[in-house]
């Protein structure tokens, strides 16, 4: 029997309250998409610069914070978990005032 492959990103969900006051989970990517839709709709034709960096910082900072908590501050484990080298992790932690 073949086992169905799970996409690890499917576990990244956000709990939301629907119109019937029920809590449901939706993929993180849907929440990011909605946040961007809201942001872009408020621009009213204005040009925007560095949107990529803005969005990345909004996701990267809390991700680093949670991974460092999960690994109890072990940078080697955190870097492995994130799939980056330890030097890169240290730079990112410094960037966000976390290291």
Swiss-Prot record:
One of its GO terms (biological process) is positive regulation of DNA-templated transcription. InterPro entries: Fis_DNA-bd, Homeodomain-like_sf, HTH_Fis, Trans_regulatory_Fis. GO terms for molecular function: DNA-binding transcription factor activity; sequence-specific DNA binding. Signal peptide: none annotated. Keywords: Activator, DNA-binding, Transcription, Transcription regulation. Pfam families: HTH_8. Residues 75-94 bind DNA. Homodimer. Activates ribosomal RNA transcription. Plays a direct role in upstream activation of rRNA promoters. Belongs to the transcriptional regulatory Fis family. This is DNA-binding protein Fis. The gene is fis.
């Amino acid at each position: 029997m073949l086992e169905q492959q799970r996409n690890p990103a499917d576990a990244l969900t956000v709990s939301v309250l629907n119109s019937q006051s029920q809590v449901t989970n939706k993929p993180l990517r849907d929440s990011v998409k909605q946040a961007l839709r809201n942001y872009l709709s408020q621009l009213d034709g204005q040009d925007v610069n560095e949107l990529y960096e803005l969005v990345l910082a909004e996701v990267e900072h809390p991700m680093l914070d949670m991974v460092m908590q999960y690994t109890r501050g072990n940078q080697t484990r955190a870097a492995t978990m994130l799939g980056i080298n330890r030097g890169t992790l240290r730079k990112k932690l410094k960037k966000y005032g976390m290291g």
